[in-house]
């Protein structure tokens, strides 16, 4: 019997490797790379800060290859304060009350995300956290820390309906699907 050569990757390890490229320590805390802040029609109107970098390579991803495949070259590093200011300023200008980080995986750079949420907590907005869940499964404390923010709505974007579909859609090892389910359980257990 011949063994089939596989190019699949470990989704956790890829997230951690991407994090080294798109997150750095700055004078005011963790800085993360972003490439734009924009209004969007989703959720009845929302302001989105598009970050750089994701640990998955989904075949259907809407992010341009020019962004997805060039995390070192694309975007600029911003502090949580700068991202919060950009989101809130545009939301006020547009009369919107919902905010999110998208364009990449928002859970990459945990300290940055939590500091961003700290900055947004008193703004009277709703924050939609769209995530693949991989790092929420990997880091047992992530869901507990997110539970401190009652204005955050977490949406785990499942990549397929089973391990086989996950592997087919992302190119990652199939057990990544189990990590997505574990993330959901961690969030439920934390009351998120």
Describe the residue ranges of each PLM region:
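Conserved alpha-helical substructure of the radical SAM core
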Residues: 65-99
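Conserved AdoMet/S-adenosylmethionine-binding subsite of the radical SAM
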Residues: 88-98, 103-192
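Residue-level signal for well-ordered alpha-helical segments
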Residues: 26-38, 60, 76-78, 93, ...
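Pocket-edge positions in alpha/beta enzyme catalytic cores
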Residues: 46, 72-75, 105, 172
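Conserved active-site and cofactor/substrate-binding residues in soluble primary-metabolism enzymes
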Residues: 49, 78, 111
């Amino acid at each position: 019997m011949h063994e089939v050569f596989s190019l699949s990757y470990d989704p956790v390890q890829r997230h951690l490797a991407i994090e080294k490229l798109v997150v750095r320590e700055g004078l005011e805390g963790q800085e993360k790379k972003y490439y734009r802040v924009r209004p969007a029609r989703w959720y009845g109107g929302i302001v989105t800060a598009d970050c750089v970098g994701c640990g998955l390579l989904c075949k259907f991803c809407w992010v341009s290859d020019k962004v997805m495949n060039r995390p070192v070259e694309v975007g600029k590093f911003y502090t949580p304060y700068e991202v919060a200011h950009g989101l809130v300023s545009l939301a006020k200008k547009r009369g919107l009350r919902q905010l999110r980080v998208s364009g990449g995986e928002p859970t990459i750079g945990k300290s940055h995300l939590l500091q961003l949420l700290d900055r947004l907590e008193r703004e009277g907005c709703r924050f939609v956290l769209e995530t693949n869940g991989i790092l929420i499964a990997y880091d047992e404390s992530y869901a507990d820390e997110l539970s401190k923010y009652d204005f955050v709505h977490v949406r785990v974007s499942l990549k397929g309906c089973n391990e086989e579909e996950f592997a087919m859609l992302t190119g990652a090892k199939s057990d990544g699907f189990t990590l997505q389910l574990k993330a959901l359980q961690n969030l439920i257990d934390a009351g998120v």
